[in-house]
């Protein structure tokens, strides 16, 4: 038997469960055994994106002693759109050059 941790974070709270599983258990099996999907109905069990220690893994990867399984939520905003909006805001606030988008020249 090995001990692993299953974590799921929301903007305001995080759930962390330590469970004991049989050696050879996969990431997906451990998530199901932990019961975290029942505690958080917002987790889409059909489209899980999982990771171990900040690295995305396939659901069939076998676990090792002390692994931390992370359940990732989908991105809310497109990263390119978010970057574009931040750049436009910086131009409006004078923190960026209106033509080049770079830092304004200090004189």
Curated annotation (Swiss-Prot):
Stored InterPro entries: Mopterin_synth/thiamin_S_b, RnfH, RnfH_sf
Coiled-coil segments: none
Entries under Pfam families matching the protein: Ub-RnfH
Domain of life: Bacteria
Entry-linked SUPFAM superfamilies: MoaD/ThiS
Region (Disordered): 82-107
Family the UniProt entry places it in: Belongs to the UPF0125 (RnfH) family.
Protein name in the entry: Protein RnfH
């Amino acid at each position: 038997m090995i001990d692993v941790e299953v974590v799921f974070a929301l903007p305001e709270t995080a759930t962390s469960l330590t469970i004991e599983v049989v050696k050879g258990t996969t990431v997906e099996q451990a998530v199901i055994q932990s019961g975290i999907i029942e505690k958080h109905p917002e987790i889409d069990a059909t489209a899980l994106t999982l990771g171990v220690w900040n690295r995305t893994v396939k659901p069939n990867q076998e676990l090792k002693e002390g692994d931390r399984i992370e359940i990732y939520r989908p991105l809310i905003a497109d990263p390119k759109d978010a970057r574009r909006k931040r750049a436009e805001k910086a131009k409006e606030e004078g923190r960026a050059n209106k033509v080049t988008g770079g830092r304004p020249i200090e004189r």
